[in-house]
Amino acid sequence: MTPQLDRRSFLKAMGIVTAAAACGGGGAGAPAPATATGAAPTAAAKPSGRISVYSALNESTNNQFVAAFKAATPGVEVDLLPLAAAGELQTRIKAEKASPKADVFIGGDSSFHDGLGKDGLLETYESPAASAVAKESKDPNRNWTGFYFGIFGIVMNTDRVNKEVGGAKPTSWDDLLDPKWKGKLILGSPITTGGGYIFIATQVFRFNKDEAKAMDYMKRFHANVAQYPGTSPQAIQLVSQGQFVAAPNWAHDILTEKVKNPGIDLAIPKGTGYEIGAVSVIKGTKNPVAAKAFVDWVLTKEAGELNVKLSNRVSVRTDVPPAPGAPTLTSVELVNYDRDWAAANKDRLLKLWQQTVGI
């Protein structure tokens, strides 16, 4: 894995330090979109046949994304298994390693793809279109490529926040430890969702990798948590329906839901974490040409623009502007998130968290 850069060096390597300063952007601390290059590559062999795609993207993205790929790649049919819990898809791919059932894994934090790559369950592939992706947002071992950034925030049911917790938005993660939140919070399961784990890792990095302090935080946070839903979209829905007051969750998914329900709101505390959403080809694919063509298309400007339009995610490409009002890596204050360390210590931290909170 590549060595972790400090936040300013990382932004500089991605080409956005100057832009951030010029725009008066907020915190530092993350990778940013890469300089875009030319059009989508042409496959050596014409893709055809059928592929199966395991998707951790949400419903608002999946169907239109697949339809757009099929329109751009005549002759390829796509069977889609949508399951907005990347951890469950990772487990499924591992269980099927002797006889793979899917060709492509799309969505979810890169740590899920990274784990599969280390287990030898992903094909080595660097798409020609990956030249538009900065090296900090793709696997140096060529197992996966990032195509979007997700920023972690908090979804709130505005009516219940006003009535039950005083109406003020949380400005720090520590605000969620106040006893007034007891029984009112939920969090996507850290075991099955990338967001849940990134929430834990964010606390570790907030405390400069002092795991004792981070686990003390998670224990106190757990005291205010009513449940841990299996998917991040499910947690947003429960807050949107008014069943719970708030949930740490993905900013882009919160903004997408807010279009349907203006009664929710987004807060982004200082020192937040982020994900690099990835795409990869599964080892043993029966249709490698079409599977690689899918990855090629996902990395195009066209796909990046569609992803932003459908989901409010931030594209890794600099030639794809963010959605209006969507937070970006330079408009929020990010924690110094050591992605390599988080991936390498994921299993251990999850076990430590389970021991700490008694789950």
Regions found by a protein language model. Name each.
Residues 2-18:
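N-terminal secretory signal peptides and thylakoid transit peptides that target proteins
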Residues 55-63, 84-86, 101-243:
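Extracytoplasmic ligand-binding site segments that recognize negatively charged/polar headgroups
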Residues 47-57, 76-81:
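Short, well-ordered beta-strand elements
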Residues 150, 180-188, 217-221, 228-229, 259-285, 298-321:
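Periplasmic-binding protein-like
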Residues 111-115, 240, 244-263:
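A ligand-binding cleft/hinge motif common to bilobed small-molecule-binding domains
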Residues 155-160, 201-205, 276-288, 306-307:
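A bilobed periplasmic-binding-protein/Venus flytrap-type ligand-binding module shared by bacterial periplasmic
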Residues 24-34:
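Bacterial lipoprotein signal-peptidase II cleavage site
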